[in-house]
Amino acid sequence: MSETRKCQVLVVGAGPGGYVAAIRAGQLGLDTVIVEGDKAGGTCLIRGCIPSKAMIHASERFEHLAHHKDGHMGISISGDVALDMPALVSWKDDIVERLNKGVEHLLKIAGAELIKGDFTTEETFVELMEC
């Protein structure tokens, strides 16, 4: 299904560059549309930097707990330190979802319309008009 929508600012892609541009354009009162084929936040937020750093952070915490088994720093842990991988993945997914919803909310309150889908055009040019 194709849809025609006129606007003053069209942003293709809701990654870190796209959503920041759309938020600012919306804050300036421009009729802004941002088109994203996946989730708002882009690769960095959805499957790159943020999820990777969450998993690295959790693994570092796990390693630090393991050091306390022998009373390191006067802290003792009784029993084995265990990792529940499904729970860890769920925790990471919750972080990603929360940040994704945060980006969508920022777009909404700025007045930028997020359209989930792919942007296509048969035109080979973009017409620029003075605002």
PLM segments and residue spans:
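Short glycine/serine/threonine-rich phosphate/pyrophosphate-binding segments
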Residues: 17-21
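Glycine-rich Rossmann-fold phosphate-binding loop(s) that bind the pyrophosphate
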Residues: 13-16, 37-38
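Glycine-rich flavin
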Residues: 3-7, 23-30, 35-131
